């Protein structure tokens, strides 16, 4: 089954006040028996101002000066996202993410800034909530449910985390492990 894994890196926690810096898109074909990456894109977004929180920037480690040298305006970024969806015929493909509501809210804000309609499918599967449901049923250890904790439980390398595309790849591996349970 095809799934579109998404992740964002942002300047803070509120889409009303903070900006989307990068978007990772990872198209996968996944079943219990396999996980294959079919396509990917990593988009860097440039804004006129950032209102960056120190906490967010220390987590994602993005240098805004270097970022701005390769980043594109929100409208162009939205067009690239929609082109990725069109190219791969993903209009009805479920989204997958870890704490995906966070990413979807920032993407919605990005598309508003880009004055563009999103072509994302609205249904999604959230690996954080999948993990929490397993915790409720005592099928996995109790405790934190962040991506690092879940990835480490499954022995998935987390060293490249906090890069939108790398986080997509980690989330895809986590999703693959979760559907096996």
Question: Predicted regions span which residues?
Answer:
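A structural motif
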Residues: 139-150
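Conserved protein kinase catalytic core
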Residues: 13-15, 132, 173
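Acidic two-metal-ion nuclease catalytic site recognized across multiple nuclease folds
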Residues: 152-153, 165, 169-181
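Conserved non-catalytic scaffold segment of RNase H-like nuclease domains
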Residues: 1-108, 148-156, 162
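Short, surface-exposed recognition loops or helix-turn segments adjacent to catalytic cores
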Residues: 121-125, 160-168
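Substrate-recognition/cap helix-loop segment adjacent to the acidic, metal-dependent catalytic center
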Residues: 101-125
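Short alpha-helix plus adjacent loop in nuclease-associated cores
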Residues: 124-141
